[in-house]
């Protein structure tokens, strides 16, 4: 986590809050350690808190649930529930009154509730976890393939592209494909799927990698 922050030109002490989406180790692993070490406020659902089962003493711990909004400095953070195999998973949009950033990873489907929560985003980070053919041909056991592709799993490249097509692109200026599987996807496959929807629209398409993430983006509203 610290290395990734450093790549973005930040230090852990620069953080105003840490928001945990759910309890799976690849999402919550370093959050408590950083929060304790640098006295950073934590936000998560109560279900995530219960599932983590850790000692949060000495940490400013805040709970949020579907539909809640809370402030972090000048940003309004809005929580919404998603379809994932976790206790009480959430995703978030962030709004400063001028521009809105939405994030959607770790969901096996896009419900009308999710679509409404992500309305009027200027930038969207969306999960492109796997290529369907790569997953089908992978060495993963059958049960794991079913878990990944279920409605409580992850979005494929095609699912992400389908959502973008149905959701509309009128306000979007940046789309970031994220949470790519290292075994069942390739950045170029994710980008091709999104590019096919974007077409000739003036929208920047970026694919985040597990190693490098993505660079800072300046957002402006309509």
Model-derived regions, located:
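Active-site environment of divalent metal-dependent phosphoester hydrolases
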Residues: 24-28, 49-51, 86-87, 110-112, ...
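General small-molecule cofactor/ligand-binding pocket signal
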Residues: 43, 62-65, 78, 206-208
